[in-house]
From Swiss-Prot:
Coiled coil: none annotated. InterPro entries: Ribosomal_bS18, Ribosomal_bS18_sf. Residues 85-105 are annotated as: Disordered. Belongs to the bacterial ribosomal protein bS18 family. Part of the 30S ribosomal subunit. Forms a tight heterodimer with protein bS6. The lineage of its organism: Bacteria, Bacillati, Mycoplasmatota, Mycoplasmoidales, Metamycoplasmataceae. NCBIfam families: S18. Residues 95-105 have a biased composition (Basic and acidic residues). Binds as a heterodimer with protein bS6 to the central domain of the 16S rRNA, where it helps stabilize the platform of the 30S subunit. SUPFAM superfamilies: Ribosomal protein S18. GO terms for biological process: translation. It comes from Mycoplasmopsis pulmonis (strain UAB CTIP). The gene is rpsR. This is Small ribosomal subunit protein bS18.
């Protein structure tokens, strides 16, 4: 019975074809920012190989190149986020200030 299960497992496996293999890229250069940015998510993190379908060897090369590009300031460590803060509204409702203001009458 194990023999039949092994056959089913082999049939269901699909061959992984990565973007690097499709383009015929053998060497990953840290200066190629356009290529490296395809392997970074919106928060600036390196995408895992399960998502990118890159082999373990190529994933290590990618990681090394992305880290080098970050250290050389070619890639940001994190993506820019719009920081929103609540505006500081200073309202003075103290009775002393109301009395101190001269009336227009």
């Amino acid at each position: 019975m194990n023999h039949n299960k092994d056959k089913l497992k082999k049939k269901n496996k699909r061959k992984r074809v990565s973007f690097l293999d499709e383009q015929g890229i053998n060497y990953i250069d840290y200066k190629d920012v356009e290529l490296l940015s395809k392997f970074i998510n919106s928060h600036g993190k390196i995408l895992p190989s399960k998502i990118t379908d890159v082999s373990a060897k190529r994933q290590r090369m990618l990681t090394r190149a992305i880290k080098r590009a970050r250290n050389m300031a070619l890639l940001p460590f994190t993506q820019e986020r719009v920081r929103t803060q609540k505006p500081l509204i200073v309202t003075s409702n103290s009775p002393k200030e109301k009395e101190a203001k001269p009336s227009a009458q």
